[in-house]
């Protein structure tokens, strides 16, 4: 496992291309989901200096906060509520350039201005979401 990230200063695409194999190396051989999610959030936050990055995991009818990096976050989000709950319900990645313009946005922090939420699927079902705020 690599303990230090090699960060490059290129285009966003070049930065992501450089980071992906490093993240794969971080999680390779580790079977604990929480440990892997924690390392992924740390790597993304360090590489891109996002305001907040973390995971929510599906527990019955809501998303429950999982490993994250950043300020204190909302602990539970219902399906269809906010950007995370909507991405879960629609099984679609949502890119929101202005969170104030998103109907029903949940403001965990007024400092967050934009958000990307990526649903994580297995066998066609969402088991969690990756949430990134800038």
Regions found by a protein language model. Name each.
Residues 47, 107-112:
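Short loop/turn motifs at secondary-structure junctions and domain boundaries
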Residues 58-108:
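Regulatory sensory and allosteric helical modules in signal-transduction proteins
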Residues 129-134:
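Short beta-strand-to-loop transition segments that serve as allosteric relay/switch motifs
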Residues 114-121:
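A short, aliphatic-rich beta-strand micro-motif
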Residues 50, 115, 127:
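Short coil/loop residues immediately preceding or within conserved phosphate-binding loops
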Residues 1-67:
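Intrinsically disordered, low-complexity terminal regulatory regions
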